Amino acid sequence: MPPTINMGIPGASSSVTGGVSGKRVLLAEPRGYCAGVDRAVETVERALEKHGAPVYVRHEIVHNRYVVDTLAKAGAVFVEQTDEVPEGAIVVFSAHGVAPTVHVEAAARNLKTIDATCPLVTKVHNEAKRFARDDYDILLVGHEGHEEVVGTAGEAPDHVQVVDNPDAVDKVTVRDPDKVIWLSQTTLSVDETMETVRRLREKFPTLQDPPSDDICYATQNRQVAVKAMAPECELVIVVGSKNSSNSVRLVEVALGAGSDAAHLVDYAEDIDPTWLNGVTTVGVTSGASVPEVLVRGVLDRLAEYGYGTVQPVTTANETLVFALPREIRPARS
């Protein structure tokens, strides 16, 4: 295998050069599972080991078909609403977080709850609560109806307005333009979010920024890696599910960064051979909720089509690990 091409950050927009001619794959690093997804999936696995099936999970634990199907076969039961869980049963809240009303509903049904909310989502929840206490108008940049946005907005429903995209800014009104802050969903396109914020700031010049970045490190890192390789690719394949916000954003980022085409696939079988007509360089990455086994399947399929040379394109090294929820942590010996 050719050596890793370490683009680094901030040099992510530089050209990828590896000295390889002919068909090749540029493989984005980092890709796949982030710390929050790893924690959430392991939470369900540990809950099943500790309590046995069934373990109920409110919403998909993460937005990936393979992961959800695998956990369902192991005994996880996925439900949309809390009242679908039998009284007294165990329920896991997904990585996307829930509104406070969901905790109240669970307590009323005497459910044993395990909260697998990503700590970075919890951070945004805490910001919403803090600024609501100070009576700010909170402009939450995010996708209307996404579980994470519903949960964050639920922390302060009287103070939060969801701003779905840059064009939605025109409809935003606030009580006091000097007490406005923006927060964001953690899985958005960095570029589109900044465009939305730019327009908000034009309208509200004293708009405050979040205390720290709300778009998570993994979302940003995966977008940077795609930006690094996309200019060299005629095609970028993003492994991920259609309901995965961060995976869909990677397709958009690839197209915006110069790839001629970009497609989202759940499995290797989803690759249409006609996509490869006239293509020399294929970029491959995966969303933050995608296990590596699915990427390996895509690489194997591409090798069958003659793309056996794989060059990693590294823009960051991720080492972050989140502690498991206390309810399912291993007992100390």
UniProtKB/Swiss-Prot annotation:
Positions that bind dimethylallyl diphosphate: H63, H96, H146, S244, S245, N246, S289
| Record's keyword annotation contains Isomerase | no
EC assignment: 1.17.7.4
Binding-site list for isopentenyl diphosphate: H63, H96, H146, S244, S245, N246, S289
* InterPro entries named in the record: LytB/IspH
Q: Where is the active site?
A: E148
Provide the binding site for [4Fe-4S] cluster. C34, C118, C216
Keywords of this entry: 4Fe-4S, Iron, Iron-sulfur, Isoprene biosynthesis, Metal-binding, Oxidoreductase
In this chain, (2E)-4-hydroxy-3-methylbut-2-enyl diphosphate is annotated as bound at: H63, H96, H146, T186, S244, S245, N246, S289
Pathway(s) the chain acts in: Isoprenoid biosynthesis; dimethylallyl diphosphate biosynthesis; dimethylallyl diphosphate from (2E)-4-hydroxy-3-methylbutenyl diphosphate: step 1/1; Isoprenoid biosynthesis; isopentenyl diphosphate biosynthesis via DXP pathway; isopentenyl diphosphate from 1-deoxy-D-xylulose 5-phosphate: step 6/6
In alphabetical order, the GO MF annotations are:
4 iron, 4 sulfur cluster binding; 4-hydroxy-3-methylbut-2-enyl diphosphate reductase activity; metal ion binding
Q: Which CDD domains match?
A: lytB_ispH (cd13944)
The note on the cofactor says: Binds 1 [4Fe-4S] cluster per subunit.
Cite a single GO BP annotation: isopentenyl diphosphate biosynthetic process, methylerythritol 4-phosphate pathway
As cofactor, the record names: [4Fe-4S] cluster
What this protein is reported to do is described as: Catalyzes the conversion of 1-hydroxy-2-methyl-2-(E)-butenyl 4-diphosphate (HMBPP) into a mixture of isopentenyl diphosphate (IPP) and dimethylallyl diphosphate (DMAPP). Acts in the terminal step of the DOXP/MEP pathway for isoprenoid precursor biosynthesis.
Recorded protein name is 4-hydroxy-3-methylbut-2-enyl diphosphate reductase
